[in-house]
């Protein structure tokens, strides 16, 4: 008994199989990251310095204005295998209601504080608490950046960590960390990005990246 094969169909199927394997092998992991925090915390300066760290065109740090709306940048990491799409969203009180619109699509959150401004501790604490208790970001890695460490009048990093831990102690288990940085000088900026990439990849089952 002779079995006839549809050679045309077999070749077509093989082509799509090979194409799918090729695309899967060569696709990159894309993660959306929110950069949040009060106004004047240094969010945009952090973003621009991060771009500069990875040899991307960036703005003059002396000409950065308060963000009204959002700034967006894509930064390749991990030998170009991972792409971070960073959303720097305005931190003025009237703009914070916009933050929730981004929660459902984010894979990680960077929360930036001005560690020299003791008068706004309660304000940024309340803002951070409102973020991490939201069901839309359950399980999402949270990285707090204690910015402006180049200044002599910064709070002790241990005091900032204590405040963060008091906020985070009642939420579901997730990766979180407090890092001291200076967005102006670049100290700690790359370390922050590297930490976040590792946590995003650990969290892939809960928040899968977009492959393309």
Regions found by a protein language model. Name each.
Residues 2-212:
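TRAFAC-class small GTPase G-domain
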């Amino acid at each position: 008994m002779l079995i006839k094969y549809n050679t045309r169909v077999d070749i077509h199927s093989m082509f799509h199989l090979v194409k799918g394997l090729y695309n899967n092998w060569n696709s990159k992991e894309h993660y959306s990251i929110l950069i949040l925090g009060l106004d004047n915390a240094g969010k945009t300066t952090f973003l621009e310095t991060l771009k500069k760290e990875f040899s991307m065109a960036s703005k003059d740090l002396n000409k950065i204005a308060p963000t009204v709306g959002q700034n967006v940048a894509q930064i390749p990491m991990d030998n170009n295998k991972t792409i971070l799409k960073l959303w720097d969203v305005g931190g003025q009180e009237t703009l914070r209601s916009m933050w929730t619109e981004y929660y459902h699509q984010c894979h990680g959150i960077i929360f930036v504080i001005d560690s020299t401004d003791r008068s706004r501790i309660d304000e940024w604490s309340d803002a951070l608490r409102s973020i991490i208790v939201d069901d839309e970001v359950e399980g999402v890695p949270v990285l707090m950046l204690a910015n402006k460490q180049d200044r002599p009048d910064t709070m002790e990093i241990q005091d900032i960590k204590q405040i963060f831990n008091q906020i985070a102690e009642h939420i579901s288990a997730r990766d979180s960390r407090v890092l001291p940085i200076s967005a102006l000088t670049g100290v700690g900026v790359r370390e922050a990005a590297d930490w976040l990439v590792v946590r995003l990849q650990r969290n892939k089952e809960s928040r899968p990246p977009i492959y393309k």
